[in-house]
Amino acid sequence: MNKQFYIESMHNNLHILFAMGVIQDEMYKCPLCMQSFSDDEVVKNLTEEDVPQASLGGKRISLTCRSCNSTCGHSIDVNLLNAIVGLEQRKFFPSTDRKVNLIHEGQRLGANLHIDADRQLFLEIDAKRNNPKVWDEYRENILKENALIDLQDVPLKRDERLISAALLKNAYLLLFARTGYTFLADSYYDDLRMQISNPKPYILPERLWTLQNISVADGIYLCRDNRLRGFFVVYTLSKVMQYRVCVFIPSPNVPYLAATYHLRNILAYDRIRVEIMPSYFDFFNERNAIARLRKWCYGWDKF
């Protein structure tokens, strides 16, 4: 990520929007919490954000404040990673490792389970990390040839609400990295930002996202159905396997509740009219492109 180029592009976007009377000032705002920062503070206090997180194949595409970056990383992002890891652990992929517990008559022994390229299983036990008496008991009386032992994965922290917030955050920042503040500065999106920063309460209706084998390429798609006027953001999470995510972010003309109602009523073989957001439009530096996107977001005409 070219941080200086990114900052200059965002400043140009803010300058144009300020001249159009859309925003109150030209100060950079963290896209997640909308806190304002001076030019000096942007360089010092904003950090590069991987979208999706680096552990799931993401790249640095945005700048967020240290508070949002840290909070998201330690709360919602880890839940999304653990959800993917948990799915893949069930498949026992070759050349992978995981932490497990051995359980025998109420005694627990921690270990690392290694699955080699031929899918043979090997237990690696770190004696220093276990109770010495428990380890002695396992070594001398339990871990015998052909012994039956209950093997359990170490539980991973997973919360559906936090996973949902992480999926929304990724889509929101992908859209922001493409369009800047052009329309996302609207207070309409405060609820979306609040849902990301405070996942537990139901601020937005469920569900604006889906995890399916989507046939279209990653990208941002404009929906041509006015009932769902907004953006389908499609992206991929990568671990051992790849997982396609599609998130719908409505335009300010479409209430969130109405959007989820129409999304729920889409049948398996229904066709949704969409078009890829044209790559040749520069929503940071070209006033005409910014005006055109805003007209589409706040009106009902074609893009």
Spell out what each predicted region is.
Residues C72-I115:
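Polybasic, low-complexity binding patches
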Residues C30-C33, C65-C68:
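Short cysteine-rich clusters marking metal-coordination/redox-active sites
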Residues H15-M27, Q53-K59:
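Short, flexible, mixed-charge glycine/proline-rich loop motifs
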Residues D136-F303:
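C-terminal, charged low-complexity interaction regions
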Residues F5-A19, K44-V51:
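Short Cys/His-rich Zn2+-coordinating modules
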Residues P52-S67, G86-K99:
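Short microdomains enriched in Cys/His and/or Lys/Arg
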Residues F37-I61:
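Histidine-centered nuclease catalytic patch
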Residues F37-D39, N69-C72:
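Cys/His-rich microdomains that often coordinate metals
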